[in-house]
Amino acid sequence: MRSVRIAILVCLSASGVAAMAVVQRGAGTTRPPSANAPAEATSRIVAAAVALTAMLDESGRAKLQFPFAGPQRTKWSNLPSGIFRREGLRLGDLSAAQRSAVMNLLAAALSPAGYRKVVDIMRGDEVLRRNQSTGGGRNAAPNAGRGRGGPAGPGGGVTFGDDEYYLAFLGTPSVTVPWMLQFGGHHLAINLTLAGSQAAMVPSLPAAQPATYTFEGRTVRPLGNENDKAFALINALDDTQRHQAILGYRVADLVLGPGQDGRTIQPEGIRASALSPSQQTMMWSIAEEWAGIMNTVFAEPRMAEIRSNLRDTYFAWSGPTTNGSPAYFRIQGPTLLIEYAPQQDSVDHIHTIYRDPTNDYGAKFVGK
């Protein structure tokens, strides 16, 4: 039996955001991950982090590094620069080689699909910047400041673009000692906590504006799978199931977005155990769009944990059920919270949140 090996190649695109090609070598069935795979994945992430750090001068390292247990871990937001002040290493201040090293680190930390999602979100913000500089267009951003999220910056206008994303290390990258990789900007917050062979990428916020745009002749929808899979599920329910799933009130925004750590929502909607096996599969596929952003080695056991709570997992819906309409949905279980919330009835401006109420910031394995 021949194995399939995947190589991730990262290069800078014309816009300055790294592009990724996934090259398949060999053919046949992929072998299951070894028992050492999580530790090996952590080692690759740490190696990429160390390689980046070695490229920085003293000032750059000072911007990058924060205490592990300090206040920086909760300083993340969906808001753009000029409204929310981020700290860390700003992509726009880096050389091309340093920027490529940041994107190589993200490629190591994320799955191929997760990496593409992050790049597509960043490119979407570059679309906003270009439209801002030319006076707008279909993808202009009149409501970009909407949403909760931390301290404002000191005056100035709102700034979009793929330069406005920041990287921070909380603690020192290590294969044994807990540390955290934080990466974010407008409509993106990745909080990845690593402790040896354990990893948690919660809370995280992948969002999109514009939700659809054109890049190099192709249509890009950063959250298109999430949207389409959810509408497919709600329309696969029978009348009785829909009555249970659809909330009797409108949800206009994320309930547990930025700044809402430690809070909970009363479960609502239809229990996953009331779904047919095929409908359950559809729901898990939706959840995997968020859980599967991080490196696959860590995402697979995370999805197994989520599935194990079938009887206590709920799917809730608020809004129209025709695809192309602005509708909120939520998947919630003992170790899972996913929310998807179009902003101000716009299908072109989407916020989402992904949490584990038992393990945000890796609480289970770092003891904080």
PLM ranges: what are they?
Residues 22-107, 111-368:
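A cross-kingdom marker for long, charged
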Residues 1-6:
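Positively charged n-region of N-terminal signal peptides that target proteins for export
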